[in-house]
């Protein structure tokens, strides 16, 4: 923790809080220039040139008329370098901003159908590493904000992780590694990758008989409560499903943990999430 705080020190305020509105966060993003192709670098250069032209003729660099095609002034060159650098970092550090497509498809026991509005930078989220078997869930709320909750008990000293949309439930190990390397320039070594967790249909589903009966009862209750519009109680019941599995010492990965997580995130989208 001390090492992490030392790295973050230039970006923290007096209360040791990360100021998300501080543009030094953008400057500090990992750029991975060595992983970019010539075409990608050319595209960034062209966009940078367009920005500079717009700033120049918008009067940002002063009222003086500048002939079309004139070389960059020293101020323009500095700003161009900053814009290029920030664009490099943004490439690998964007998060989706989504909304749930239709309330009618939310049943409380199935994955919600969400639509991407766009992408954004969330400096606090960038402090979390990706895991294909993440211990959190997140949704978009109030337009441009994020709500993140634990999907199971996170013990003291355990890393809090995020998922970049590439999950072990839907993609094989090889597919995940390829997608993460291409989209985020890293290879994942989370527990799900090290142990090559199976996909949803192949996950363990066995439970002690009394635990299974209680779990199935809670899940049926969620369907009924969701149908009646009692979504706050659905949230509590989803959490109770997870707590039931933890009390029975059922280790992840397990199909019932994922079923409980689906219920939890469906309820979260219904109660708090953006609507498409």
What role is predicted for each listed range?
Residues 231, 274-275:
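TPR-repeat structural position
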Residues 1-131:
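SET-domain substrate-recognition elements in eukaryotic SAM-dependent protein methyltransferases
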């Amino acid at each position: 923790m001390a090492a992490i705080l030392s790295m973050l020190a230039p970006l923290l305020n007096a209360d040791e809080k990360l100021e998300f509105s501080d543009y030094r966060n953008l400057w500090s993003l990992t750029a991975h220039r060595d992983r970019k192709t010539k075409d990608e670098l050319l595209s960034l250069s062209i966009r940078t040139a367009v920005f500079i032209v717009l700033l120049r003729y918008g009067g940002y660099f002063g009222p003086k008329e500048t002939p079309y095609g004139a070389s960059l002034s020293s101020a323009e060159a500095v700003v161009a370098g900053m814009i290029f650098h920030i664009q490099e970092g943004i490439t690998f550090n964007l998060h989706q901003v989504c909304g749930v497509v239709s309330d009618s498809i939310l049943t409380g026991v199935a994955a919600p159908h969400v639509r991407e509005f766009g992408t954004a930078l969330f400096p606090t989220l960038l402090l979390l590493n990706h895991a294909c078997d993440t211990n959190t869930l997140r949704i978009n709320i109030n337009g441009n904000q994020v709500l993140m909750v634990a999907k199971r008990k996170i013990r003291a000293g355990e890393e809090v992780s995020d998922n970049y949309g590439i999950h072990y439930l839907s993609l094989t190990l090889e597919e995940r590694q390829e997608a993460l390397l291409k989209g985020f320039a890293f290879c994942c070594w989370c527990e799900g990758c090290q142990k090559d967790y199976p996909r949803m249909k192949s996950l363990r589903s066995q439970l002690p008989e009394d635990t299974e009966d209680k779990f199935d009862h809670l899940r049926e209750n969620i369907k009924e409560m969701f149908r009646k519009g009692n979504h706050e109680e659905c949230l509590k019941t989803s959490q109770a499903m997870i707590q039931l599995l933890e009390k029975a010492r059922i280790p992840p990965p397990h199909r019932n943990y994922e079923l409980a997580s689906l219920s939890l995130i469906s309820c979260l989208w219904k109660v708090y999430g953006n609507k498409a």
